């Protein structure tokens, strides 16, 4: 049985065809680590985990990379555009790095408690700003944005 996934670009379900035979690269956005998550925040990780497990059962080797937003998350539907970590830092008296480190541990503990398999590798947004800008440029160039 083939795997069919919804393609948000074409707005259709399409047969999954990996770029490399039996290998899948999966990049997902991780949490913004400034506060405790609620179950709605964790739902995407459950969905990605189910997809990873299906791919593995189908014989694919999955390399899953997840970013952790440890700075620069500026907007949501219900705020004034202030960086979430700067705001949490001001309110707690701790620096942004301490807050991020604490909530990364909370997030990883939540994954474990929910039996969600961890990504192959985590990386912090602050460690790869130049690379992310280039990645977005390539996606835009290819018409995905």
Language-model features: where?
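NTP-dependent nucleotidyl-transfer catalytic core
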Residues: 1-145
